[in-house]
Amino acid sequence: MTEILHVIGQGLRYPCYIILLLLIAVAIIEIGFVIYEAAQRAGSDKANTVELLHNMRGCAPDAIRAMLEEEPFLNRQKLAFSKLLGTADLPEEARIAAAKRMLEAEEDYYRRIVRITDTVAKLGPMFGLLGTLIPLGPGIVALGQGDTATLSQSMSVAFDTTIAGLIAAAVCSVISAIRKRWYAADLSDVETVMEGCLQEMKEAER
């Protein structure tokens, strides 16, 4: 039984190293993506939703659509606003349901992006610990045989894998926190504008 467990443990060594390298690669790629996204956000104005709601007062759906096209929203968000305004001829309940569905689609879009770094943040320490424990077995055996060279090599690999896993997890945790703050603000703006659109379409029916 112990031999089987030993074979399984040592057989996981190289897959564990490969996964750790992949996690580090994902972390590096995500650093590039978040820097690019931060540069885009810094280079564009943020929509003033309060002022926008005031400007939308008493406007027809087509006028609101044209107004939103001039605002610094993402193309995907502008398309959602346009689709919502296109439901002006539907009953109020249908418009509200459509708005909820579009908002859920936005939330799902952001959730998929953050899920990548969240996954790395969870797996990094796990595989780092796994990569630490696997070499310790042969290292302890080498210690019992007086083979300090093998022991030192095993310890070096163990510490390296721990560091790699923790670095990947730390980087992705920070990226996830930054993105969650951005996306929460984006979703709040989208929800506010959609509520304004629904209110103006309701007023237009009277």
What residue spans do the PLM features occupy?
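Hydrophobic alpha-helical transmembrane segments of small proteolipidic membrane proteins, enriched
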Residues: 1-74, 83, 104-186
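Cytosol/matrix-facing juxtamembrane amphipathic
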Residues: 7, 182-206
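Amphipathic alpha-helices that form helix-helix packing interfaces
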Residues: 77-84, 113, 193, 197
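Short, charged cytosolic
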Residues: 82-104
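Short leucine-rich amphipathic alpha-helices used at interfaces
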Residues: 96-97, 102-103, 108-109, 165, ...
